[in-house]
Swiss-Prot record:
Widely expressed. The modification Phosphoserine is found at S7. The record marks Y414 as: Transition state stabilizer. This is Aminopeptidase B. It is an enzyme of class 3 (hydrolase). Substrate binds at G298, G299, M300, E301, N302. Monomer. Exopeptidase which selectively removes arginine and/or lysine residues from the N-terminus of several peptide substrates including Arg(0)-Leu-enkephalin, Arg(0)-Met-enkephalin and Arg(-1)-Lys(0)-somatostatin-14. Can hydrolyze leukotriene A4 (LTA-4) into leukotriene B4 (LTB-4). GO terms for molecular function: aminopeptidase activity; cobalt ion binding; copper ion binding; metalloaminopeptidase activity; peptide binding; zinc ion binding. It holds the Pfam family Peptidase_M1_N. It is found in: Secreted.
Amino acid sequence: MESSGPSSCHSAARRPLHSAQAVDVASASSFRAFEILHLHLDLRAEFGPPGPGPGSRGLNGKATLELRCLLPEGASELRLDSHSCLEVMAATLLRGQPGDQQQLTEPVPFHTQPFSHYGQALCVVFPKPCCAAERFRLELTYRVGEGPGVCWLAPEQTAGKKKPFVYTQGQAVLNRAFFPCFDTPAVKCTYSALVEVPDGFTAVMSASTWERRGPNKFFFQMSQPIPSYLIALAIGDLASAEVGPRSRVWAEPCLIEAAKEEYNGVIEEFLATGEKLFGPYVWGRYDLLFMPPSFPFGGMENPCLTFVTPCLLAGDRSLADVIIHEISHSWFGNLVTNANWGEFWLNEGFTMYAQRRISTILFGAAYTCLEAATGRALLRQHMDVSGEENPLNKLRVKIEPGVDPDDTYNETPYEKGYCFVSYLAHLVGDQEQFDKFLKAYVDEFKFQSILAEDFLEFYLEYFPELKKKGVDSIPGFEFNRWLNTPGWPPYLPDLSPGDSLMKPAEELAELWAASEPDMQAIEAVAISTWKTYQLVYFLDKILQKSPLPPGNVKKLGETYPKISNAQNAELRLRWGQIILKNDHQEEFWKVKDFLQSQGKQKYTLPLYHAMMGGSEMARTLAKETFSATASQLHSNVVNYVQQILAPKGS
């Protein structure tokens, strides 16, 4: 289908956005009354014992916010997002231009106000109201110790077991527990930071510039505007190695060789393919930081420096799609951002689509369809557990005041979002035209935060012939239905190119489900050549058919040590689920072993669900495993596991 091309819908002035009026019930801040222009952090990290009291671990220093008043009538107070774990000691207002003789510096009163269980408001009162369009700086002296935004790890929670480690995790609303801010994805600013660390430690941040300033100080600058949730810091015993012209890996010294081996030369190929499809990579560097094993996520797309789980060091480059996913966020999420967390699908649905476009070009359609089929299976699993009509199974989630956006996290924005973007590509009917559209979309909305309306209006402007046809209101596929009706996606992309890989896996699973497995037929299937996702797909089918007839799981494990003794986390997760679903108690230790080796939420929670849904022995295993590993898990993951072990109202 011929496109009108970007020229006809591109005006020199930026279009007015629906998102300019969007509310964010998860922020206590006055982000519509002030524009944040720049943030500077000046922090000193201290590793001591946990808890309050002198000498305890914490970050001490200052946050300086450069702001401009947007209200025509001026303003007499400013509200920032903060948290009870932040102790603000002083607030100073700097009026006039920096370096100006007339610059006024005055201490200003401040107080906190309750907001929700995940944050509070920090209210700064101006002695003299600021005028419309006035620029000023606010300097806050503060300290943060224990809290949800800054994660302190004892040496035993790291890979090297020798030195402590600290990192921050901002998404979704945790950076208010790192520094006072407008903690909403609706607004963006540049930032800089000066971080002082103890001897023998290195600091890294999500910034385009990294400089050593003396033995223990590091300076960072992010020259592109980003939302607060993407500002990230990590401090530990870190080494680095170059793996491409604009990429290096960072990791603890004991992991650096494995990290280099796994990713040397491959990242540039992913980046270059992304640029061909979606336009220039604007962030300068793309580095990877391999986190300690307790890191709860697969990856966090902090710009310039993606934080990733060490589970990706599979030794065979088989989990590189996670890196492709995080790289895809460089365009979708980091450059064009959801304006509030109810629109999370704009970040994740597009990123899944982009990841699978890159993967199709590099690894072929069969492999990508197979990977997408495992994603679809996860969505099916989620909807079976939560109920299709659950309001969280809409693309646009209504987040109620007081609800932590993190608690709405599930597969829907990823996989149903992917289906919606695929449906829009299907309406266009020409992959090349849709790729061009995505490039134009990124260019149109770069460095901005948007709502679904902004995107869909642009789509219909770009393809006027589709607008004329009324594709937004085709019965059963209405855009409004996609966004606001819970349940299974109305359209599923065709994954049949993956049949050549899926069919053999389905047939093999069928053989293992027989009460008397035909070992001759089973041994005729050479799984030694299968890629990881083919094995994952096979295990998903085995799990669906479980419990298998008695003795079959034991035999399956003996037949395929490649699966039952795998080091690959995706295989270990599914083997653990199969062990539990079949109550194969002699291998229960493998579940505990896996949960002790890492703390990724995506692997941890399903195994606790499986243990608590299993036999008495399995439930005992859950409690024993949790008491052995709780101290090494992220606080959010601890809370979720506790809810599985003792559901509210039980």
